[in-house]
């Protein structure tokens, strides 16, 4: 009877240990790949990230938004002229400089609208240059490596009782599901930012048309601040990855495999949280809303 019980116990142990090793091996591969891809993704300009989407957005902006921006520009300049006349006692106190001012503002506004795409792309080119310089300075490996604490893991697991092994198996299963969820979160942040950039740039001529307006000028100024926030969000993301890289390098020093794995999960959750915060932080820095 004892022989059967011992055989059953060993069989359960082998099954649980095999399941634990299977859950742990390659658990962080997808997250490591996504984290390594962050620097590549955020360091690209809208044109370099996806040329097909870029060309489509450029065509939509030039063919649809620019004519609408022209109408808005005419309205804004007309309203400004009417206000200028009303402020000067219905032309009784008018000076010649008012005419030159109106002509200059109109010419500047037309120049801005016709070169909106170049201005917008210039903002992201500048941000890409900053990110490239930051990535060159940081140059840290952010991959999670727990192979050093898994070398003698299987013999240590076989020495454990069934109860702790069941608990460890459930933990490894839960951690595996958690890491996939974190992989999806990182994907959403990085790709969501690029989609937001394309959406914002597609309507660029409309807010830029109001840039020179007295009453409507705040629309264009806030739009420029939003562009700067989106561009420099990439720099904040690079800093987050650099901090994450420093933290995960200490994981290999852990002797306890469970502590090492939960540390990996904790650091990755922290990375996801900070990545989600980079957008609002960048907007608060540039006072964009």
Regions found by a protein language model. Give the residues of each.
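Alpha-helical transmembrane segments of polytopic integral membrane proteins
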Residues: 74-78, 113-120, 188, 192, ...
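Loop-to-transmembrane-helix entry motif
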Residues: 60-68, 103-107, 184, 188, ...
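Hydrophobic alpha-helical transmembrane segments
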Residues: 67-79, 197
